[in-house]
């Protein structure tokens, strides 16, 4: 069996990736989220496949087909809610995974980091299109508002929006193409994950200290397979608790009303995991400026390796940087809260201040703080 594991062309790849992989001996539970994201992707693809068997991407029947899945299909309700809440779990793991990367300086592996940013954009696009499919009020108006943002692009904006819509408004053509893209994107994401892992295994994993750990490696199996299995157990427990006890906790009640182009909901807002970016978008009065800020709020991650001015890789031994990191986390939570509030005083000014602080922290305060810490090292 050992010979087959080490010599068979396919088994050899699996062996080098998940069994005999030399791994730092001191990586903490923060390194569990990569495998948890793999689990989330698997859950989403499997549940999505079963939902696609019963869903119809037509404006007249989409809403009732989702109702049919929940009422008439065997265990359809649990498949539907596993898929909807699985997306929330996916984003929780994503945010923690990215946060871990920022805290421990994993962004210095620039190829792995950049593929990760592409993955983040792809998952966000997939989730947005998935939210449109049930064809409820928030699905329709969310699709209208978010796609309309592209009209802010000079010269080609209006034509681009109508090209995406497949007409002069969000309608049957839009829903059909969103379903097609929502179906194919997870497989593209799975392929990107392979590339992400390929680049990661070129360098090996980072560790909490940020120090090269070549002298102290252990095999991935059994140590980290067991550790990942515990993570799987905890995540599935949390997901099933959410699905079985309060499946609609993270959803919007407006989405239980069929889409009506003649009736606008009082507060149009996306799913909770997009609220921080939505708050940044709304904080700028100019349409094009808002769209740029929205894109930059994620794309700013790409310049993080360039903003790394510290002599140390990790924040483990940098208390001032740690403080700024947790201020950034608090700021993102504030933006998430603001994104769900109506556009009125005092939420407008809080959103503007939080958006300004977000960019200030990443672009100015954290790099300057790292330089100060470099000076303190000499004392």
Curated annotation (Swiss-Prot):
Keywords: Electron transport, Heme, Iron, Membrane, Metal-binding, Mitochondrion, Mitochondrion inner membrane, Respiratory chain, Transmembrane, Transmembrane helix, Transport, Ubiquinone. Binds 2 heme b groups non-covalently. SUPFAM superfamilies: a domain/subunit of cytochrome bc1 complex (Ubiquinol-cytochrome c reductase), Transmembrane di-heme cytochromes. Pfam families: Cytochrom_B_C, Cytochrome_B. One of its GO terms (molecular function) is metal ion binding. The chain crosses the membrane at residues 33-53, 77-98, 113-133, 178-198, 226-246, 288-308, 320-340, 347-367. Heme b b566 binds at residues 97, 196. It is found in: Mitochondrion inner membrane. Heme b b562 binds at residues 83, 182. The keyword Signal does not apply. One of its GO terms (cellular component) is mitochondrial inner membrane. It is a multi-pass membrane protein. Its cofactor is heme b. One of its GO terms (biological process) is mitochondrial electron transport, ubiquinol to cytochrome c. Component of the ubiquinol-cytochrome c reductase complex (complex III or cytochrome b-c1 complex) that is part of the mitochondrial respiratory chain. The b-c1 complex mediates electron transfer from ubiquinol to cytochrome c. Contributes to the generation of a proton gradient across the mitochondrial membrane that is then used for ATP synthesis. The cytochrome bc1 complex contains 11 subunits: 3 respiratory subunits (MT-CYB, CYC1 and UQCRFS1), 2 core proteins (UQCRC1 and UQCRC2) and 6 low-molecular weight proteins (UQCRH/QCR6, UQCRB/QCR7, UQCRQ/QCR8, UQCR10/QCR9, UQCR11/QCR10 and a cleavage product of UQCRFS1). This cytochrome bc1 complex then forms a dimer. Belongs to the cytochrome b family. Heme 1 (or BL or b562) is low-potential and absorbs at about 562 nm, and heme 2 (or BH or b566) is high-potential and absorbs at about 566 nm. This is Cytochrome b. It comes from Ochotona princeps (Southern American pika).
